[in-house]
Each structure stands twice: as structure tokens, then as C-alpha cells.
Amino acid sequence: MKTLYDKLWSDHVVHAESDDPNGMVILYIDRHLVHEVTSPQAFESLKLAGRKPWRTGSILAVADHNVPTTDRSSGISDPVSRLQVETLDQNCEEFAITEFRMNDERQGIVHVIGPEQGATLPGMTVVCGDSHTSTHGAFACLAFGIGTSEVEHVLATQCLVARKSKTMLVRVEGDLPPGVTAKDIALAVIGEIGTAGGTGYAIEFAGSAIRSLSMEGRMTLCNMAIEAGARAGMVGADEVTIDYIKGRPFAPQGALWDQAVAYWRTLKSDEDAVFDRMVELKAVNIKPQVTWGTSPEMVTTVDGYVPDPADISDPTKRHDVEHALGYMGLKPKMPIQEITLDKVFIGSCTNSRIEDLRAAAEIVKGKRIAPNIRLAMVVPGSGLVKSMAEKEGLDKIFLSAGFEWREPGCSMCLAMNDDRLLPGERCASTSNRNFEGRQGPGGRTHLVSPAMAAAAAIAGHFVDVRSFIR
């Protein structure tokens, strides 16, 4: 009667404070992913205490937040960004930690390179000083983000003090309609339960629609679990999982592979498992989604309208909508497809994998971006994704359409590097957060799938991507 979360949790409890199932425990961590933003203070504290990382073989490091996505031959211009990247390089060199440096082809966004390298394996506990570590739960992992002090704890002890979450099952049954993607499922779920709906929970995604997703799609879904307030998101292991991992650099080989696969096939919730909460959606009812406000829960369908605060009875919610519309520069009851755009960003740890780029390229092939689009950019999630896309000719498709083809990194997902919105600019983005100022002070972000972003770039405004593929 165990859920997948229960199995992963119990397998990693080193010590329990009491018999209380909701009490604090010491949890063992299998894989520690590290980037340049949340690790410098952790390493510094470790050194001041005269300690060394306990198990360097569990760590994989990469710089992603601050790296430029344009020409890298002259290095990083911003002194703070440069210092963070150089500090990561120095710490990894000092402690013999595996790191993919800025000019290594394997460099990329930490939540792209972990699975890509086979460093994320079913049954693991995976942590990183980054909110969207939940991405790795797509591999039947218990994966979650941690703070800088916890990064130090894991470096020093390979363990964390933690409290068990409640469990939520999000079941999506049926076949997804053409033009509807994992990103649309994620936004539809968040629209249904809200950004606080998953608070205190670990979400497992299941159902025939989820099983039909590729690993890239499952990663997108689990990546967005944190935006529903959840501690973690996960999908049970199956043959899709196993096929994706096989042959990757960090994956087990030979007899160890056979042993691992036998174990991985057990990593799913039992048929009679009991969850604390269940949410059910029918795939056939899900349409392409577009956020209109300043929170991922402020979302509607592409054929929908901006809400009217006058129709909302709850005064707090009404105020939130009024404030969001003011910031976003939108009018009540405005059709989503009348929202014009300035920029388009295809990338981030949510949607920068090869499947995402293929979907966007399919839409823009043989077309040109609209005259009002000041910048449309594609930022692959890793050097290996970029190389694969170039071998398939996707870069030429994007360049011919008027897109910029960039180097891998977090890029315009957040205003921590040179890629950002100017005040008042409006962007269709495949990233995960549309908070005020997320992509730059005063920037206005609308979250969509890669295909929807590509279609918006061509039209100059939001348009139903389904009209492109019929």
C-alpha cells in the first residue's frame, strides 16, 4: 500500500527522531547537483569549519545562471557574475569535483545536464540549491530544491534533516489533443489547484496521458510542480524511463545495469496506495494555455479572455487580479489572442530540450517572425542539445525565421545575466515563472509551451497553435 514517495522516503531515512511518521528525520542524499549561485557561501563555510565534502563522487557541478548566451570568447563582463562562476571553478578544482565548465560542450542548465548525463537515476534522492530540482522527479526520484545552508550540510555530511510531505496524486487520463503539451498539462493543473494547492505535498503525476509523455515531457511537468507549491513532483518508472537512461555516461553498465533495471521497475506506487489528496483531469479537456497575470495560477486557455475583477466576489482575489492587470498592462475581458508581444524566449530548464526545439522549429519552418517582435531567441538547454539540434538543421530553421540562436544557459528565465526584458516589454516565454520583474524590472511575462511561443513569434501576438498544425 505504498506510494512511490513513501518508497523513496523510507529507503533513505538514516535516523528518525521519534516514532512519529511526521517527525524530523535524517535523510541520505544520493546525488548533489551544484551551480554557481547558491554554492559559494556553502563552500566557504565548509572551509572555515576545516571540513571537506564527504562524498565528492555524488556531486556534479555546472555554471548556468550567470553565463552569457552570446559570444563567450571574451568571458563574462559583469564582475559579480564572473566572480560567482570563477569561484565555482576554483571550489571544484580544489575538491576534485566533476564540473562542466563554461566552454565544455557538456555545459548547460543543471536540470538539463543531470538527466542528459545519466546522473539522475530512478530511486535516488536528488538535491540542488535551486527551486526547480523537482524536474528530476520525472525519473522516479525524490528530488527537491534546498537553501545554501542545506547545500553546506549535504556537502559536509551527505545528509539532510527533513520532514515527510503529504502525498498528492494528479491523474490525467486520455489522449492529449494535437498541439497540447506537457507544459499545458502543468499550467492547467496549476490553474486548477492554485500556486498554494500543492503546499506541503509531494505530487505524483499518473494516468494514461502521463505515460504517453516522453521523458522530456515528464521533466517539464515535474519542473512545474514547484509552481503549484509542491515540495517535489514525480512520475513512476517505466520502459520509457529505462530506455532514456540506457547508455548515458553516468548510467550503470553490464551486470550493474541489469540489477538497476530490476530495481527501477519496482519504483511506482502500489495499486492500492492511498494518497492524501487526488486531483483528476481529462486530457481531452486540456487546451493550449497562456498565463495573463503575475503568477502561474493566473492562466487561461488560448481561446479565453483576461478576467474581469468585477466578476470576482472574494475581495483579496479581486485585488490581486486588479494589481496583476495593472502591472501587465491588460484590460478586463480582453481576448488572449489580442495580446501583442515584443519578445519571445524559447529556453529554460522547463522547455529547452531537443523535443522542445523540434516542436518550435516545426511551427516556424518556412516562416518569418512578425515585424513587431523586437527579439526572438532560442537558447538550448545544454551544449549537447545545441549540437544535436544543429545536426538536425534546427538552427538554420530558426535563423531563417529571424530568431537568434544562442549558447546554453538559464538566459532570460531570470534577470541574472545579460538576457532580460526592458521595462514594459512583453514576452512569450517557455520558462516557469511570470512574477513581477522575473525577466527584468518592469518586464511582462506570459508562460506558454514552445510551440505556442513559436506561433506567437510568427503572428506577433498570441494565436492558437492548433491552427498551425491542422
Swiss-Prot record:
One annotated GO molecular function: 4 iron, 4 sulfur cluster binding
Pathway info: Amino-acid biosynthesis; L-leucine biosynthesis; L-leucine from 3-methyl-2-oxobutanoate: step 2/4
Signal sequence bounds: none
Enzyme class: lyase
Subunit composition and interactions: Heterodimer of LeuC and LeuD.
Disulfide cysteine pairs (residue numbers): none
Cofactor: [4Fe-4S] cluster
Catalytic activity, as annotated: (2R,3S)-3-isopropylmalate = (2S)-2-isopropylmalate
UniProt organism field: Nitrosomonas europaea (strain ATCC 19718 / CIP 103999 / KCTC 2705 / NBRC 14298)
EC number: 4.2.1.33
Family to which the UniProt record says this protein belongs: Belongs to the aconitase/IPM isomerase family. LeuC type 1 subfamily.
Entry note: cofactor: Binds 1 [4Fe-4S] cluster per subunit.
Function: Catalyzes the isomerization between 2-isopropylmalate and 3-isopropylmalate, via the formation of 2-isopropylmaleate.
Residue numbers binding [4Fe-4S] cluster: 349, 410, 413
Name of one Pfam family that matches: Aconitase
Keyword Transmembrane applies: no
GO biological process, one term: L-leucine biosynthetic process
Protein name, UniProt field: 3-isopropylmalate dehydratase large subunit
Entry keyword set: 4Fe-4S, Amino-acid biosynthesis, Branched-chain amino acid biosynthesis, Iron, Iron-sulfur, Leucine biosynthesis, Lyase, Metal-binding
